[in-house]
């Protein structure tokens, strides 16, 4: 199965990409209520990699270059008539990339989403091969209302984010905040640092509502996704009538 993946690396370092021993991370993560629960002993821990994700097909891509930014729009579709749009914007004056994910129901029946990622990154670290033990550090910020963020750094192995001997069971760390307090327990931020190659991938969510970040690993590659808190974590779902469209917050 062909999978469209977003792989971000520092400028000029693409020649050092070595990863070919892990599954590609789909560009968009989504789950519908009619989907079966995730496999690989991961039920109740994650809603990623649903049957819906496995049926997504590439439907085209455009790139527009402006004076101040580059906008790359990628289209995906699935057999139920859902059309997904992933918009990646790279700004000339900002080192951060912006991702916007939306879905439109082009079919004749209503469908209910119970998870939709705002962004997802995978194959971390693309500069490593094999398990690469003790080289991935996870950075999070613990905080609450009217408090300073406290940096917590843990090895991926300390969070049980390492594959089994057969790379079958999937492990996940899902965290965030439920309710209108965007910071209650954690700041909507997470970073994965490759200490062997001096590269860090960091992401932040921006909505003032329930949110989540999720670290996921089944094989040698680590994935990081985030956005709206899903149905399991934040009791969220969204029904799309025929012709309706929904855009996940940044």
Functional labels for PLM-detected ranges:
Residues 238-250:
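Short Pro-Gly-centered flexible turn/kink motifs
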Residues 222-232:
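Short, structured beta-strand/loop micro-motifs enriched in basic residues and often containing a Trp
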Residues 1-219, 234-236:
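Polysaccharide-binding surfaces and accessory modules of carbohydrate-active proteins
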């Amino acid at each position: 199965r062909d999978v469209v993946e977003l792989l971000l690396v520092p400028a000029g370092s693409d020649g050092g990409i070595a990863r070919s021993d892990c599954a590609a991370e789909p560009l968009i993560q989504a789950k519908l209520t009619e989907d079966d629960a995730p496999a690989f002993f991961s039920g109740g821990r994650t809603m990623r990699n649903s049957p819906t994700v496995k049926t997504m097909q590439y439907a085209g891509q455009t790139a527009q270059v402006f004076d101040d930014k580059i906008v790359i729009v990628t289209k995906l579709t699935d057999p139920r008539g859902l059309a997904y749009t992933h918009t990646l914007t790279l700004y000339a004056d900002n080192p951060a990339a912006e991702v916007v994910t939306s879905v439109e129901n082009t079919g004749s029946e209503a469908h209910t989403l119970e998870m939709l990622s705002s962004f997802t990154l995978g194959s971390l670290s693309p500069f490593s091969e094999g398990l690469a033990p003790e080289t991935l550090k996870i950075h999070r910020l613990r905080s609450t209302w009217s408090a300073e963020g406290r940096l917590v750094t843990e090895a991926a192995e300390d969070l049980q984010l390492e594959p089994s001997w057969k790379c079958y069971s999937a492990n996940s760390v899902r965290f965030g905040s439920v309710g209108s307090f965007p910071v209650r327990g954690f700041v909507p931020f997470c970073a994965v640092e490759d200490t062997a190659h001096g590269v860090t991938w960091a992401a932040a969510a921006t909505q003032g509502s329930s949110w989540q970040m999720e670290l996921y690993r089944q094989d040698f590659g680590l994935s990081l996704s985030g956005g709206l808190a899903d149905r399991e974590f934040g009791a969220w779902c969204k029904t799309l009538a025929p012709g309706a469209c929904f855009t996940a917050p940044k």
